[in-house]
Amino acid sequence: ECEVDAICDGENFLIPGIMEQVERTGVHSGDSICVYPAQHLTQDEIDTMVDYTGRFARELHVNGLVNVQYAVSNGKVYVIEVNPRSSRTVPYISKVTGVPMVDLAVRCCLGEKLADMGYGTGLHPNAPYVAVKVPVFSFEKLHGVDTQFGPEMKSTGEVLGIAPSFHEAMMKGLVAAGYQFKTPGPGSCVIISVKGQRQGRGPPSLPGSCTTTATRSTARPAPPSS
């Protein structure tokens, strides 16, 4: 799933950047790890999102902010929803791209044109770093809350990791969100849970001193269909 926040003056539009959600489609964007710039899109998929966003903004006569959520599968881009308003990702994408979206949107509402604001139109160039937004949850304090991810948002905050590479930015974000990482050693226990269609490929390489456990379906995968 990908998300785009854009500004439109009624004619031209500006997309500061395309964001990619790590969690599966259907998980509320506020509960999903969000990556800028998107790491797994082809140029054709990017061009399609830019084209669709511009067409939506013009057709809806947007004069200000618009948010579009996309799902990408097997090279095809699907539209989940279009919201002619600001979204919760506007502060994030504004900060990591340096494009003051709210300021530019207000100026558009007052009659100015994007072409005269100095940020260009279309898709803004990517920043020379990766920014990962990680949600923060309060399950330890809110007892009895359903921890299953879905369309209802359950996170209570978020943190940001910025680094030259995706993996470093991800690690910074996870550490800032309170996740602890330890090197497996004697006495360690590693829990493995593998998605259905990936079962049967074998567990990852782990130190022999670790105790390995798994969820029921991973430990006893269903036999392959004939």
Residue ranges, per PLM feature:
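ATP-dependent carboxylate activation and anion-phosphoryl transfer catalytic cores
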Residues: 1-200, 225
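Surface-exposed amphipathic alpha-helices with a cationic face
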Residues: 203-213
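Residues within well-ordered alpha-helices
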Residues: 206, 223-226
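Short internal beta-strands
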Residues: 215-222
